[in-house]
């Protein structure tokens, strides 16, 4: 049978062990949704959980739900559920704000404690959101800092000097797939007084 034929696809669908999973999602009829990297489709279970949170925990429980519904421990509870997916111990993972919000917080704090150092070093081909966040931190700090972009032809460690407060670097470049030797970069940055 031709693997590009409708018949082949239908035969494969009929024997797909995951075919029944489609019913777990709230998708409009006829929609094939393959763009789940940033916003997956809503599940029936998630919808019910949100409704319970809205109507019972928030609507009825009000502020008591921080304790009664254990909201206070959700960062640890959710982290423990994520831990096995990444091969970590449940006690070593915590759920927090988005990566972007956390990057803004940590970059702001790092720049603030690095008094006398005014440069953030990053790759020009770094994930765009990370660079936008660095630009936002600089604006927030009154334009007293500057962003130094490392070009592909340069080595990051060659850009480190006594004015570098922070090195902002993604372990794996999302465009090229290049993996940085973070231990070496961190060691070089720390030797020059910069944070990573």
Stretches with model-predicted labels:
Residues 1-196:
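Pyridoxal 5′-phosphate
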